[in-house]
């Protein structure tokens, strides 16, 4: 309290400089000390600065916590007179997305839902949730995330191959999440292995045989429809996993990626409540010396990935999770969110 009172004696620009050096938690504590500081710490310019500075470092983002990026380019206040009408609430945007604070923004389940979920967890289910996994990050990276998944039992043990078959696709592979829940992943590759490997070595795109391109829509965007076999998969699964290439300069055309995602989550093929997990993947961990000394990150930030894939336009719940293929870092966090969206009690 004494320090907070002392800071009031500083010039306003110096007060703002000091606030930029505080953590969001410390700022909120400062705001609780007096009405003066409560007003000061809500300054939109301060929180817009924090958003621009910190968003690229966030390891995940989802449909609840995604900031309105277009607001970063709008005036801080509306009206002829200064502060006549406040503009966008950047403080709320920041605290919703900040990893240490975001949990409180998720909708709370009513008490009866918690009891129902607990009772359901006591009864073994006949089928495990199934997810379709696809995307260029499975095929373009130097390290295969799919191969790592199958051979890293300390992260996700393989539970086996179920009997339920889908013609031309197979039955997928079942995994066990933290010795609690089984789930099944159906892997959808764009083409055969030889063509994928050649395209990876030459860093070229391949003709995606999962989709049929049907020209362009009225807005000029490409329009795709899944092949009949892939449509059968979309109707059978409980959600989707899109593996995106997060290595800068190596991602596919965002417009095409968005159109293909939109084709698979089409409400005509299943409920729009089914979740989409985007694993924003790079081959290897970023070395500490590069991470701390270079301003150029070796991965696309997850907020930028969500924007590139136009995820805020989807009716489905979605999440982007930073992932590393070599160590599978981030995979468990993404799977936890996915299973939770499917109604499993974790």
Locate each region found by the language model.
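Switch I (effector-binding) loop of TRAFAC-class P-loop GTPase G-domains
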Residues: 150-200
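Eukaryotic intrinsically disordered and solvent-exposed regulatory patches
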Residues: 4-5, 24, 115-121, 169-173, ...
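Glycine-rich phosphate-binding P-loop
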Residues: 118-159
């Amino acid at each position: 309290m004494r320090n907070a009172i002392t800071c009031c004696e500083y010039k306003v620009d110096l007060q703002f400089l000091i606030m930029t050096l505080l953590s969001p938690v410390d700022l909120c504590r400062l705001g609780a000390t007096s009405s003066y500081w409560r007003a000061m710490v809500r300054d939109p310019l301060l929180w817009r600065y924090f958003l621009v500075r910190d968003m690229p470092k966030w390891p995940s983002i989802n449909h609840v916590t995604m900031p309105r990026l277009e607001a970063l380019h709008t005036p801080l206040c509306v009206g002829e007179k200064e502060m006549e009408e406040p503009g966008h609430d950047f403080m709320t945007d920041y605290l919703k997305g900040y990893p240490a604070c975001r949990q409180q923004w998720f909708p709370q389940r009513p008490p009866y839902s918690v009891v129902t979920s607990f009772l359901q967890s006591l009864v073994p289910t006949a089928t495990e949730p199934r997810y379709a996994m696809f995307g260029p990050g499975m095929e373009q990276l130097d390290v295969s995330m799919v191969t790592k998944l199958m051979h890293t039992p300390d992260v996700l043990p393989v539970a086996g191959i179920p009997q339920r078959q889908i013609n031309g696709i197979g039955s997928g592979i079942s995994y066990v999440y933290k010795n609690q829940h089984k789930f099944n992943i159906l892997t959808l590759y764009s083409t055969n292995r030889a063509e994928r490997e050649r395209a990876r070595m030459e860093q070229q795109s391949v003709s995606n045989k999962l989709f049929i391109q049907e020209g362009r829509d009225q807005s000029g965007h490409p329009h795709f429809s899944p092949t009949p076999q892939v449509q059968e998969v979309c109707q059978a699964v409980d959600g989707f996993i899109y593996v995106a290439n997060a290595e800068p300069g190596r991602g596919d055309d965002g417009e095409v990626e968005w159109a293909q995602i939109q084709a698979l989550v089409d409400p005509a093929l299943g409920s729009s409540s089914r979740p989409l997990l985007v694993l924003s993947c790079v081959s290897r961990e970023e070395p500490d010396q590069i991470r701390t000394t270079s301003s150029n990150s070796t991965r696309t930030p997850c907020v930028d990935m969500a924007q590139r894939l136009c995820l805020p336009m989807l009716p489905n719940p979605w999440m982007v999770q930073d992932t590393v293929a070599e160590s599978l870092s981030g995979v468990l966090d993404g799977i936890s969110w996915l299973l939770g969206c499917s109604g499993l009690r974790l």
